Amino acid sequence: SAASDVYKRQAFEITRAEGIEAVNAKNVAAYLKCSTQPVMYNFATIEELKLAVFDQAFEYMKRKVVFPKGKKSEYPMREVGLDYIAFARSEPNIFRLLFESSYAERCPVDDLGIGLDFQPVIEAFAKFLNISIEEARAEWLIRYFMVHGLACRIVNQKVDYSDEQLLEFMVRFDAGRR
């Protein structure tokens, strides 16, 4: 319903600002200047609302990170990696929800590390390096673990690398993989 969409959007914004732990009927109602009753009328439990926020967060990440169709890049894998890290840096609470919270098990995972459609990137990478799709998929998995590790460290404020440093890591990684 339109009302439940409003509550989901507000819960998503609370999550972006404060983390999923801050999502409760009282906080959603306070932001919308209403009582908690309409919030709870639309969701059987707060857990149901949080699950809806997770789904919304996953769709949001897909729009921000997945290699846009038609976008041309000389280094598609590098670009996606940098976009992934940029997403983690700009949306740390959404990143934590998706990958580090008790809800992370809901994140669709496949043999590429996460259930996102990176096939266009893999195909471009295979063509760029003149390797098979299978080899490109294997390279993607190795890169995913490196990029995801950097993103996790940045999100948890263990390190903060500049964009230039991150690009240099990617360039060196690429040089070492050939």
Question: What residue spans do the PLM features occupy?
Answer:
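Short, small-residue-biased leader/transition segments that mark boundaries at the very start
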Residues: 2-6
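Short hydrophobic clusters on alpha-helical segments that form packing/core surfaces
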Residues: 7-15, 23, 57, 61, ...
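Helix-turn-helix
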Residues: 14-48, 52
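Alpha-helical DNA-contacting segments of helix-turn-helix folds
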Residues: 15, 48-57, 98, 106, ...
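Amphipathic alpha-helical linker/stalk segments
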Residues: 51-79, 119-123
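Amphipathic alpha-helical packing segments from all-alpha helical-bundle domains
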Residues: 66, 99, 104-130, 137-141, ...
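Helical hydrophobic small-molecule/effector-binding pocket
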Residues: 77-100, 107-112
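Amphipathic C-terminal alpha-helical segment
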Residues: 97, 144-162, 175-178
